[in-house]
Amino acid sequence: MEHQLTIYNTLDRKKELFVPLHAPHVGMYVCGPTVYGDAHLGHARPAITFDVLFRYLTRLGYKVRYVRNITDVGHLEHDADEGEDKIAKKARLEQLEPMEVVQYYLNRYHKAMEALNVLPPSIEPHASGHIIEQIELVKKILDAGYAYESQGSVYFDVAKYNKDYHYGKLSGRNLDDVLNTTRELDGQEEKHNPADFALWKRAQPEHIMRWPSPWGDGFPGWHAECTAMGRKYLGEHFDIHGGGMDLIFPHHECEIAQSVASQGDDMVHYWMHNNMITINGTKMGKSLGNFITLDEFFSGSHKLLTQAYSPMTIRFFILQAHYRSPVDFSNEALQAAEKGLSRLMEAVDSLEKITPAATSNVDVKSLRTKCFEAMNDDLNTPIVISHLFDGAKMINNIIAGNNTISADDLKDLKEVFHTFCFDILGLKEEIGSSDGREAAYGKVVDMLLEQRVKAKANKDWATSDLIRNELTALGFEIKDTKDGFEWKLNK
């Protein structure tokens, strides 16, 4: 491949050269949402992070099979295998079938992802559609001796596994630390050890979501689905497993244990994790009740928001930080992102207004190289954006007459902005920006301003001023140029 991509491997705690197991094919699995409520900003971050990785790997010429699961069963209220299934609880409270809840919120999740310009994955498997595969996984772990049946449930034997392997190698924990921080909970007596986790849970009589198994009616533990579905669609060994850093422990740690216990080694080569979205330094999440949904951002309807923010503003806001750095929500930060995005999109639009010269005194090749170098450095999107802002300055200087650019360089500059702004970062021009009026009024405004140019040429200053004043009153900003005019609709 032309470019040498390095990515930070959480397992080894360092950046490593990305070398696919079966180039040019790449297998990538990312933990998707548990669909029992509307998607919030915390859901947008992993979706956008791994969308950029998907886009970039594709741009580098790899054939990527991107699997992002949907958790629609087995995710209990608490990680210690106690409490009610989150979706079943929502269904009970709303007096709906669990799959009605799943379908409703999944439709809304897809709509939000489409608004954010997140590409759909290659495969989007549901946990409830892979019960057979999860039962087979549990059988293999039982046969290997790393699990036990207890009162109709099956638990992973962490202590026994830890004698042969290292439980905690991903999160950097040892078993004593895990035991010291694991609470003894009521109803946990069937476990040998508080740190043991459920592979299969016995369904209580009132439990709606249940399937027959060799151990009786029940449902799979949360961790089983990703191991089973990753193996089914990507094989026993694949390249990348991603998710939020809050999944490192226990979810991804348990996935590694399940994989090793069932096949003798870890399925995953590179473990990647994005950092969290915070509000006043605290993780944003449904379980904490401090989240703002994406629809609330788009409409400005949450009490913490001073205005509405477009989907591309949200995307740009997230990409302005490196994916492994925390992002703290504030209206000020979002407004700054909105202005930055506007500057970038104006630069893209201005490219069409440039008349090439015979010679060039700008270095487009260097700009392109710097952008690729930043992406190859563990997807350093904030550095890419800073280079694109340098490109925007270049464009403004050319338009102002301070620099010149040849036709070939102009073509290359357009390609750089299109490749990085749209193809890789996944930004797009929003027809809905400024309430959609700019796109709707474009031809009319151009026609009026052309009449104004004619009026000025005829020294009809009254008509010229009337057109300008009326458009200004409607929110249009008019700028006279040597080639005629420019305009934009202010927010």
From Swiss-Prot:
Binds 1 zinc ion per subunit. GO terms for molecular function: ATP binding; cysteine-tRNA ligase activity; zinc ion binding. It catalyses: tRNA(Cys) + L-cysteine + ATP = L-cysteinyl-tRNA(Cys) + AMP + diphosphate. Its cofactor is Zn(2+). Its main location: cytoplasm. One of its GO terms (cellular component) is cytosol. Zn(2+) binds at residues 31, 226, 251, 255. Monomer. This is Cysteine--tRNA ligase. It comes from Bacteroides fragilis (strain ATCC 25285 / DSM 2151 / CCUG 4856 / JCM 11019 / LMG 10263 / NCTC 9343 / Onslow / VPI 2553 / EN-2). The lineage of its organism: Bacteria, Pseudomonadati, Bacteroidota, Bacteroidia, Bacteroidales.
